[in-house]
Design a protein with these regions (language model features):
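Conserved small/polar residues in nucleotide/adenosyl-binding loops
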Residues: 9, 202-207
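Acidic, Ala/Val/Gly-enriched low-complexity intrinsically disordered segments
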Residues: 5-7
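Iron-associated oxidoreductase/ferritin-like identity signal
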Residues: 14-204, 212
């Protein structure tokens, strides 16, 4: 699994990778089909509830995306203790990935400013997903891994739509929150469009890595 660090964002890298955004991993077996169906079901729920409220959709995406790394890291940690075996660095890798997604979430919370009711709904959804993903991971690590890859593909679609709405002026642009500027080392004059661009680039790279 690739860990994307908070490095200086490169506009040239962004445009260089735009042609890769429409990549899709075709399911090759039953496990892949289960992962894709599960992902599409969750996408349907998000589409129904949030529609074109892309800031809120991003909050939901990152809330869910922050779970797999933490769940897998915890289970791998327990396995390492139980079998008294070295994890070969995977626990830290998975927890770093969870932290990266958490910072994405914190960024979009500053942008979307979800209400108390929306926060409660998100909390319930996260609790259900944590249990569900843990069960899936224990039953089939391959399926769990593929789910994360398809999540990243769906995130690419959502961020692309979000960026298109911002660039067309349908959604007003705004200054980037300080937390995003500090985390990704963005220029001080950066805007929401720059934040979405960097998230789109990183998510696209993650989707490509996870769906190999």
């Amino acid at each position: 699994m690739t860990i994307i660090a908070h490095v200086k964002f490169s506009i040239s890298n962004y445009f260089k990778n735009m042609s890769d955004l429409n990549k899709h991993f075709q399911p090759k077996n039953f496990s892949d089909k289960v992962a894709l169906s599960f992902t599409k079901f969750l996408r349907l729920l998000a589409d129904t509830f949030f529609k074109k409220r892309y800031g809120h959709r991003a909050v939901v995406l990152e809330t869910v995306a922050a779970v797999p790394g933490m769940v897998a890291g915890m289970l791998l940690h327990l396995k390492s203790l139980r079998k008294i075996e070295d994890d070969k660095g995977w626990i830290k890798t998975l927890l770093d990935e969870a932290e990266n997604e958490r910072m994405h979430l914190m960024t979009f919370v500053h942008i979307a400013k979800p209400t108390a009711i929306e926060r409660f709904i998100i909390m319930i959804a996260q609790f259900i997903f944590i249990l569900t993903y843990a069960i899936i991971y224990l039953v089939s690590q391959r399926t769990a891994h593929r789910i994360v890859g398809y999540f990243e593909e769906e995130a690419v679609i959502s961020y692309t739509e979000y960026l298109n709405e911002l660039e067309s002026g349908t959604i007003p642009d705004q200054p980037a929150p300080e937390i995003a500027i500090n985390y990704w080392n963005l220029p001080l004059h950066s805007t929401l469009k720059d934040v979405v661009r960097v998230c789109l680039l990183y998510t696209s790279d993650a989707a490509d890595e996870l769906c190999r």
